[in-house]
C-alpha cells in the first residue's frame, strides 16, 4: 500500500473542479477563463486585463457588460494576492453563475495545476475553457494487450485503470481434419498458410495501434495471451515490428477472448503488473471486502463511521470512489442563529435549497448556505493523520462493486475501535 501522493490528491480535486466548471453556462459571453503559464510575468497579465476592461465597456448588452466588467474586476483583485506566478502557473475562472435573470453572483475559481502550464490564454465565452487542465488528467502510461487464437484476436490497451478494446479480428482458418494421406498434408499446408496470413494481419493492426504510443513514450510494455501455443507462435514469428517485440513483458495463458479475454489477461498478469494502478486497486478492494465479510473489525464504511475512524487516527487506508459526490451543507439563520449541518448529494442539495426558503425557527429569509465536498474534507483529515488515501475508479468490476454496495466510501483500519 502507498500513501496517496500530493499530486494524486491534486488530480482528484482537479477532476472535481473541472466537472463543476463544465456544468456552468453563462447567459451571454461573460465567463472568463485565464491561463497564466509557469514563470510568466504577472504585470503583463494585469496590463492585458486592464485593456480587456476598457474594451468591455463597449459591450452593447447592459447585463453582459455589467457581468464581464464585474468578472474582470474580481480577477484583477485576486491577482493582487500574488507576488509572482505560482511555480506551476495559474488558471482563473471567473463569471456570473446566477441562474436568475437580473441577479449577479460573480464567482472565482483559482487553480494551481499539479504540473506546469505551458499555455497562455484569455477567453470570454458562454462556457469555461477547461481543455488544458483536462489534458493533465489523461493517464500518459499505457500497456498494450493482445489475445491470440487460431481464428480470432483482440487488441486493447490498459491505461490507468481502464481496459479498452481497440480492435477485434477474425479469420477463416479451418479446423483440424481427420482425413489421411496427401489430402491431409495438403489441408494442413492450407491451414498453416491461413494461420500465417491471420498472424500477419494481427501484427499489422497491432503495429498501427502501438507504434504511435511507442514513439510518444507512452507505451510501457505489451502483454500477449491466448489459450494454446498460438500466442507463442505469434510472439516468436516476425509479425510485430521489431521495436514492439522488445516491449513484450509477458506471455500469459487465458481462456477467454474479446473484452473478457483482455480483463482475464490483466488479471493473470498481476505479478507482471503488480505495481500498476489496476492491480493495486483490485488488491485494496479485495482486502477491504475480506475484512467486511469476515467481520474482523478492521474495515468500515459510510460517512459517519469513516469520519469517526479518521478522527480517532484509526484509518490505515481511506478508500473513496470516483463516483462519490456527497457534500456537507451548513445553513444558518442570520436573524436568530438557528443552524443545521447535513450531508447529501449534489442533486439533493438543489432540492434542499428550494425547500429551505425561510428559517424554521423564526421565519426569517436571511439565511446563509455553505457547501463543501465531503471527499475533499476527509482527504485533508486523512493526510493530517498520516493515513493512506486511494481513489477507487469506476472502470473495474471491483470499483463498481465498492461504489454500489458501500456507497463509494470506506476505510481499512489500523486497529479495531468501538462503535464503528
Swiss-Prot record:
- A Pfam family reported for this protein in Swiss-Prot or TrEMBL: eRF1_3
What is a single cellular component term in the Gene Ontology annotation?
cytoplasm
Alphabetical keyword list = Cytoplasm, Protein biosynthesis
The entry's family comment says: Belongs to the eukaryotic release factor 1 family.
Asked whether the keyword Signal is assigned, the reply is no
What gene is this protein translated from? prf1
Q: Where is the signal peptide?
A: none
Tell me where the transmembrane regions lie: none
Primary localization: cytoplasm
The compartments listed are: Cytoplasm
Q: Which GO terms describe its molecular function?
A: translation release factor activity, codon specific
Question: InterPro entries under this entry?
Answer: eFR1_2_sf, eRF1_1_Pelota, eRF1_1_sf, eRF1_2, eRF1_3, Peptide_chain-rel_aRF1, Peptide_chain-rel_eRF1/aRF1, Ribosomal_eL30-like_sf
Q: Which SMART domains match?
A: eRF1_1
The record describes the protein's role as: Directs the termination of nascent peptide synthesis (translation) in response to the termination codons UAA, UAG and UGA.
- Per its record, how is this protein called by name? Peptide chain release factor subunit 1
Question: Subunit notes for this chain?
Answer: Heterodimer of two subunits, one of which binds GTP.
- Identify the Gene3D superfamilies for this entry: 3.30.1330.30, eRF1 domain 1 (3.30.960.10), eRF1 domain 2 (3.30.420.60)
Amino acid at each position: 500500500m502507498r500513501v496517496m501522493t500530493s499530486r494524486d490528491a491534486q488530480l482528484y480535486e482537479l477532476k472535481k473542479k473541472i466537472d463543476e466548471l463544465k456544468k456552468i453556462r453563462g447567459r451571454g459571453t461573460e465567463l472568463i477563463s485565464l491561463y497564466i503559464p509557469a514563470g510568466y510575468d504577472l504585470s503583463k497579465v494585469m496590463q492585458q486585463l486592464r485593456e480587456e476592461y476598457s474594451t468591455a465597456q463597449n459591450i452593447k448588452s447592459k447585463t453582459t457588460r455589467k457581468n464581464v466588467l464585474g468578472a474582470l474586476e474580481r480577477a484583477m483583485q485576486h491577482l493582487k494576492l500574488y507576488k509572482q506566478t505560482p511555480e506551476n502557473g495559474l488558471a482563473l475562472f471567473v463569471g456570473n453563475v446566477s441562474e436568475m435573470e437580473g441577479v449577479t453572483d460573480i464567482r472565482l475559481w483559482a487553480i494551481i495545476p499539479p504540473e506546469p502550464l505551458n499555455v497562455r490564454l484569455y477567453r470570454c465565452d458562454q462556457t469555461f475553457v477547461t481543455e488544458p487542465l483536462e489534458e493533465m488528467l489523461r493517464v500518459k502510461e499505457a500497456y498494450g494487450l493482445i489475445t491470440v487464437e487460431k481464428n480470432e484476436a483482440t487488441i486493447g490497451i490498459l491505461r490507468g485503470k481502464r481496459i479498452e478494446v481497440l480492435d477485434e479480428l477474425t479469420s477463416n482458418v479451418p479446423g483440424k481434419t481427420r482425413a489421411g494421406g496427401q489430402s491431409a498434408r495438403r489441408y494442413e499446408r492450407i491451414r498453416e498458410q491461413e494461420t500465417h496470413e491471420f498472424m500477419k494481419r494481427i501484427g499489422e493492426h497491432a503495429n498501427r495501434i502501438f507504434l504511435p504510443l511507442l514513439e510518444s513514450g507512452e507505451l510501457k510494455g505489451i502483454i500477449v495471451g491466448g489459450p494454446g501455443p498460438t500466442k507463442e507462435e505469434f510472439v516468436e514469428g516476425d509479425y510485430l515490428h521489431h521495436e514492439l517485440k522488445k516491449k513484450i513483458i509477458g506471455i500469459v495463458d487465458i481462456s477467454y477472448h474479446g473484452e473478457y479475454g483482455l480483463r482475464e489477461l490483466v488479471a493473470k498478469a498481476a505479478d507482471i503488473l503488480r505495481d500498476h494502478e489496476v492491480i493495486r486497486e483490485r488488491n485494496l478492494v479485495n482486502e477491504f471486502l475480506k475484512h467486511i465479510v469476515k467481520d474482523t473489525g478492521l474495515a468500515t464504511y459510510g460517512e459517519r463511521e469513516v469520519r469517526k475512524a479518521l478522527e480517532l487516527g484509526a484509518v490505515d487506508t481511506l478508500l473513496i470512489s470516483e463516483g462519490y459526490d456527497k457534500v456537507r451543507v451548513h445553513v444558518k439563520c442570520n436573524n436568530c442563529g438557528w443552524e443545521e449541518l447535513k450531508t447529501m448529494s449534489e442533486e439533493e442539495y438543489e432540492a434542499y435549497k428550494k425547500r429551505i426558503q425561510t428559517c424554521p425557527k423564526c421565519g426569517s429569509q436571511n439565511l446563509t448556505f455553505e457547501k463543501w465536498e465531503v471527499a475533499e474534507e476527509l482527504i485533508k483529515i486523512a493526510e493530517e493523520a498520516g493515513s493512506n488515501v486511494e481513489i477507487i475508479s469506476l472502470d473495474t468490476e471491483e470499483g463498481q462493486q465498492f461504489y454500489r454496495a458501500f456507497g463509494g466510501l470506506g476505510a481499512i483500519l489500523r486497529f479495531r475501535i468501538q462503535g464503528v
